Amino acid sequence: MIGYTTIGVKNLDAAKTFYTKLFDAEVLVDVGRLAMIGQTTDQPMVAVCEPFNGEAPSVGNGNMIAFPGGSKENVDKMYEKAIALGASCDGEPGQRIEDVFYGAYVKDPDGNKLCFFDFS
């Protein structure tokens, strides 16, 4: 159902490096101030961009982007990879809802909150 989500960033090159390495993905579209990152354009993508209005990007209060991990082990791996790539911890991996939801939370180098999760 989701085609892509857009994240405002301060440094486009650094953001492209962070997200391509985090997801083992590629820059599929690059138009200067915006890049779309993913496996293919017919699957959900992450777009990183410098805001069109030229002002500094800001993090929305209460906004978060969640990415499926596929398993608890993969959630842990994604969390560790994000931290190694410069993200900060916003909630270590763990069971959030007993027997239902396992998640880990980070903030990317621009402060955007990300969640890696598995329904298990």
Where do the model's predicted regions map?
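Short hydrophobic/aromatic beta-strand element in the GNAT-like acyltransferase core
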Residues: 6, 45, 66, 103-104
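Vicinal oxygen chelate
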Residues: 79-120
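Conserved acetyl-CoA-binding loop of GNAT-fold acetyltransferases
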Residues: 21-28, 87-88
